[in-house]
């Protein structure tokens, strides 16, 4: 049996992308929790360029970057396909995955900005949500009825965004404004591939509230 290890952070949407893919494929693996402030020698050796999680180690060989890891898992292991078989549908899935990946920083940074910069960040998030709302019209998931590659890539907006909103006390996703996205998010959270492997919401909420408070405290500290 091939040896599979996953290095990750429990609170990281990127680590959970890989966990979901492994579980969809039915791959047995060893999960190794990393310490953000004291990264292991295994992590630093496995990802010397970026020094970050997730890292998948398969038969001693490290693969890094969550979306690259997803494709590796899909191509390497037997089980249900994650990417569509049709070349055109596969290209679309990759397009939406990249779109979502490119917007991650904007979503996260919005909650750590203030004043005019935060308002600009919100507008960027609203534009992203408009695009997604249009794409998800009359769809259960990005590829139709099947949970797949683009949905895995969307986990930050599918689950973590709601935690950010609650932790920061500011709602960006309103069902009357983004009805298709809101319906997709409800399906998403209730999907078995997702809800069986989510981090505890209360612990995640406490973690990010502490992060938000630390940022606020650092801004108000005397220079």
Curated annotation (Swiss-Prot):
What EC number(s) are associated with this protein in UniProt?
A: 2.5.1.18
- Tissue specificity of this protein: Root tip-specific expression.
Q: Which UniProt keywords apply?
A: Auxin signaling pathway, Transferase
The protein's induction, as recorded, is: By auxin.
Give the GO molecular function terms: glutathione transferase activity
Instruction: Note the InterPro entries from the entry.
Output: Glutathione-S-Trfase_C-like, Glutathione-S-Trfase_C_sf, Glutathione_S-Trfase, Glutathione_S-Trfase_N, GST_C, GST_C_Tau, Omega/Tau-like, Thioredoxin-like_sf
Q: What class of enzyme is it?
A: transferase
Q: Which Pfam families match?
A: GST_C, GST_N
Report the SS bond pairs: none
Q: Name one GO cellular component term.
A: cytoplasm
What is the catalytic activity of this protein? RX + glutathione = an S-substituted glutathione + a halide anion + H(+)
Binding of glutathione, residues: 12, 39, 53, 65-66
The entry's family comment says: Belongs to the GST superfamily. HSP26 family.
This one is known as Probable glutathione S-transferase
């Amino acid at each position: 049996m091939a040896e599979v290890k996953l290095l990750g952070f429990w609170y990281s949407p990127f680590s959970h992308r890989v966990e979901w893919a492994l579980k969809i494929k039915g791959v047995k693996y060893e999960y190794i929790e990393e310490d953000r402030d004291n990264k292991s020698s295994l992590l630093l050796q496995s990802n010397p360029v970026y020094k970050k999680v997730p890292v998948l180690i398969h038969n001693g060989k490290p693969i890094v970057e969550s979306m690259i890891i997803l494709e590796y898992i899909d191509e390497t292991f037997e089980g249900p396909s994650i990417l569509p078989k049709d070349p055109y549908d596969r290209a679309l899935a990759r397009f939406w995955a990249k779109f979502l990946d490119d917007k991650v920083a904007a979503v996260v940074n919005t909650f750590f900005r203030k004043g005019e910069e935060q308002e600009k960040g919100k507008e960027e998030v609203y534009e992203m949500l408009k695009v997604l709302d249009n794409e998800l019209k009359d769809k259960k998931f990005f590829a139709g009825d099947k949970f797949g590659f683009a949905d895995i890539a969307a986990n930050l907006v599918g689950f973590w965004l709601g935690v950010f909103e609650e932790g920061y006390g500011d709602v960006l996703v309103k069902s009357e404004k983004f009805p298709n996205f809101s319906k997709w998010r409800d399906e998403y959270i209730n999907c078995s591939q997702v809800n069986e492997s989510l981090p505890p919401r209360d612990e995640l909420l406490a973690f990010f509230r502490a992060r938000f408070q630390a940022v606020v405290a650092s801004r108000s500290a005397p220079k």
